């Protein structure tokens, strides 16, 4: 049995044993009082990936050597894991492999796109890159980032450098570091709703506060030179002083103006806040590492932060390692910790988990508390068993009160309890909206996030539409957490131009999109994802058509259900939060999850394993019949209904039910 031991507030001396679900935590000890550090951290046993990170010299080797070898089209296993920190995954097309061909290795790039914000000029660069070096499409991720698929090894350096020269980056897209920071996709900017402006500020701070400090990125991709371009999201940090206080925010609209006058100031005080040492062990000694927060082995596992405002759960805030909720009075934020969805079929020590409310933090303390949470995960997260390395397992094992005490020890002060918040609601922000600053924004549905000019009569020409919209109206883009896209900075006179372009390029207005499609998400899965066991993105449209036909058959044609699909249990499309989810568990089967909330506030439950694609109507029909006939009121959602009844009652009913719906051709 493994033990996690810590002293917090000078009083917690008892060892915290593993929880009764058998979750194993690596042995570690950090002795703290609020006043001072009392003893060093005991060294943990490291798994192979942590050993690789430690030996890499801050993310350099053996990647440098493998990339220099252009005689091969692939890289070694160690470089494969190291390359993730640089924002790329090596992939091969399994369908080609199945045909007996040699592996056709290629690389996927994932950009860091804080808050999903993408200027039109950056989109044009990405469009050119996917046309000339990729597979002629782009994909919006569920964390508001871009992915470019199909890059060859010989082109990696050119493509990544071009992205950096455009004012973006792939650093922070992947790896055991802070990944893309999420934010509601609504570019609201008015004095009646200042919370959104403040949330943008804190999202940009989170994105910059945890940037890796190694020079490996510039050495490998830019020949050691510092590029002159500015990362556009930094302008949301700019204040009248170096306090990062959002009350001092300056409204910088122009990237060019920011670059000319203010970029160096922001860089300087972000560096100051990053390295500011309170003497309680957050910052590592310079003699030990070039990474003041991460250290030589970086974090035990990926780390995710989402920022939102009270009531707006468009980002799935409860699935993040840290959720930051701007309070309505703008005095501070509520901090949530310990969310995460990845799990493994048949392994009960892995599970999906929603974040818990930990504390209210006033504005002046936010950067320090965020650093303290990351430092706790750095020092106490599991580095021996990678499947249990996420922060959620540490919070689960310690309990929220003990975890909060540990954060307080690093922070050097006690934290207030979280404040009451508004009820949550989910919005995808599609359709037309007033931004509040004299401009409009318009959300366009993108099925499964794939930006492509699709083949076929009346098929959407999304790439051409976006290029023309940017060219004709000067609009910018925001990538949404539901894999759709927001056109922003639209002048009212250009609304008719956007409408005309939508018609020209076969883009449906949101009113014409089936709610099942609008609410759905899927991961890419086959053929490129090495973890996928079955289809997701390519099959979900067919599955939605079948479900709509089933609802019509049951005289439920007006119903909406939030549906998600993944090709494996790792949870990239956040299936466990959905009302109805299909989680791949076999070549032609899915584990059926039900009972998530329409407001995305709880994890659903596993209802049935190995549901065959060919007979999915028979699995769903009795559930829909119960929902139709037994709900408490006409507006009780499917997720709330099955959650209220529970698994046993559902199974009891379905055991004696004879389906009537015809099976579709799978």
Predicted regions and their residues:
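N-terminal chloroplast transit peptides
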Residues: 1-22
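Peripheral terminal and linker regions in Fe-S/redox and tRNA-modifying enzymes
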Residues: 26-666
């Amino acid at each position: 049995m493994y033990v996690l031991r810590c002293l917090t507030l000078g009083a917690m001396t008892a060892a915290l044993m593993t929880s009764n679900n058998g979750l194993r935590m690596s042995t570690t000890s950090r002795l703290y009082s609020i006043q001072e550090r009392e003893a060093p951290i005991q060294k943990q046993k490291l798994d192979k990936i942590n050993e690789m990170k430690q030996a890499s010299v801050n993310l350099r080797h053996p990647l440098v050597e493998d990339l220099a070898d252009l005689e091969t089209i692939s890289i070694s296993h160690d470089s494969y894991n190291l390359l993730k920190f640089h924002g790329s995954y090596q992939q091969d097309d399994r369908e080609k492999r199945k045909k007996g061909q040699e592996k056709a290795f290629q690389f996927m790039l994932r950009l860091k796109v804080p808050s999903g914000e993408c200027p039109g000029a950056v989109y044009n660069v990405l469009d050119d890159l996917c046309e000339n070096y990729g597979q002629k499409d782009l994909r919006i991720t569920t964390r508001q980032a871009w992915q470019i698929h199909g890059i060859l090894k010989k082109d990696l350096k050119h493509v990544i450098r071009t992205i950096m020269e455009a004012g973006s980056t792939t650093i922070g897209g992947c790896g055991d570091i802070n990944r893309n920071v999420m934010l509601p996709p609504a570019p609201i900017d008015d004095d009646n709703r200042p919370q959104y402006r403040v949330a943008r500020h804190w999202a940009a701070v989170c994105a910059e506060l945890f940037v890796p400090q190694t020079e490996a990125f510039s050495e490998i991709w830019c020949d050691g030179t510092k590029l002159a371009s500015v990362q556009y999201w930094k302008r949301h940090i700019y204040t009248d002083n170096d306090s990062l206080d959002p009350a001092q925010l300056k409204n910088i609209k122009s990237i060019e103006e920011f670059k000319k006058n203010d970029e160096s100031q922001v860089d300087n005080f972000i560096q100051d806040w990053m390295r500011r040492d309170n003497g309680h062990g957050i910052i590592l000694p310079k003699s030990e590492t070039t990474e003041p927060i991460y250290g030589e082995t970086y974090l035990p596992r990926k780390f995710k932060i989402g920022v939102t405002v009270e009531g707006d759960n468009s980002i799935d805030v409860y699935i993040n390692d840290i959720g930051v909720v701007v309070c309505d009075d703008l005095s501070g934020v509520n901090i949530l910790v310990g969310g995460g969805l990845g799990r493994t079929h048949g392994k009960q020590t892995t599970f999906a988990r929603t974040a818990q409310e930990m504390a209210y933090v006033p504005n002046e303390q936010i950067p320090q508390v965020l650093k303290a949470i990351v430092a706790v995960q750095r020092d106490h997260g599991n580095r021996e068993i990678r499947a249990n390395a996420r922060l959620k397992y540490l919070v689960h094992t310690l309990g929220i009160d003990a975890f909060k005490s540990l954060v307080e020890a690093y922070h050097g002060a006690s934290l207030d309890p979280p404040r009451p918040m508004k009820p949550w609601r989910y919005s995808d922000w599609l359709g037309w909206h007033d931004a509040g600053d004299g401009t409009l924004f318009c959300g366009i549905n993108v099925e499964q996030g794939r930006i492509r000019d699709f083949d076929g009569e009346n098929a959407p020409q999304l790439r051409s539409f976006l290029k023309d919209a940017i060219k004709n109206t000067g609009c910018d883009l925001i990538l949404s957490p539901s894999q759709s896209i927001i056109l922003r900075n639209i002048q009212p006179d250009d609304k008719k131009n956007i409408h005309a372009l939508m018609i020209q390029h076969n883009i449906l207005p949101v009113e014409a999109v089936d709610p099942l499609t609008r609410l759905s998400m899927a991961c890419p899965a086959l053929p490129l994802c090495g973890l996928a066991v079955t289809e997701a993105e390519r099959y979900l449209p067919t599955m939605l058509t079948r479900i709509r036909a089933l609802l019509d058959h049951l005289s439920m044609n007006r119903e909406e259900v939030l549906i998600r699909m993944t090709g494996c249990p790792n949870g990239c499309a956040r299936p466990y939060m959905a009302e109805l989810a299909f989680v791949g568990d076999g070549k032609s089967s899915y584990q059926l999850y039900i009972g998530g909330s329409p407001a995305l506030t709880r994890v659903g439950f596993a209802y049935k394993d190995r549901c065959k694609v060919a007979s999915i109507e028979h699995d769903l029909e009795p559930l829909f019949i119960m929902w139709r006939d037994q709900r408490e009121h006409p507006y009780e959602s499917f997720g709330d209904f099955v959650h209220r009844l529970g698994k046993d009652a559902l199974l009891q009913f379905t055991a004696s039910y004879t389906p009537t719906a015809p099976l579709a051709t799978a």
